[in-house]
Amino acid sequence: MRAIDTNVLVRLITRDSPNQAASAEAFIEKGAWVPVLALTEAMWVLAAVYERSDADLAVAIEMLLNHKDLILQDSEAVAAALDLFRSRPSVGFSDCLILQMARKAGHLPLGTFDRGLAKIEGTQTV
């Protein structure tokens, strides 16, 4: 199976370049794997460059999770992180994903200096 990077994800979500969006769709047509690093990078690009809201990011993540041609790395952790992200708007998606991946791997508590993240079960202020 093929894999895709951050730029392909951004084109699939924003469709700001019709030619690149079409190329991205054609590339993933037979299935593509999405690394969590590409997913978190894409969410950063959408927030920082495209100024998308947290609600927009949540919709984009859900779309990717449900996309018929995409397989997200550790999709269970991504889905759990999405739920947490939606319920804790002060905590970024990347932090939610880090916590859920640590939880799944059995490596808790997650040490953090982030005050918002530290309020969530499974974390510990360092």
Language-model segments: which ranges?
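Acidic, PIN/NYN-like endoribonuclease modules and their adjacent C-terminal/linker elements
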Residues: M1, L99-V126
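Short, well-structured N-terminal submotif of metal-dependent ribonuclease cores
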Residues: M1-V34, V49-E62
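Histidine- and aromatic-rich ligand-binding microenvironments
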Residues: I4-D5, V34, V91-G92, D114-R115, ...
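Hydrophobic side chains within alpha-helical segments
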Residues: V8-V10, T14, W44, I98, ...
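Amphipathic alpha-helical segments within well-ordered protein domains
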Residues: M43-A47, E62-L65, L82, L99
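Active-site neighborhoods of divalent-metal-dependent phosphate/nucleic-acid chemistry enzymes
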Residues: D69-G111
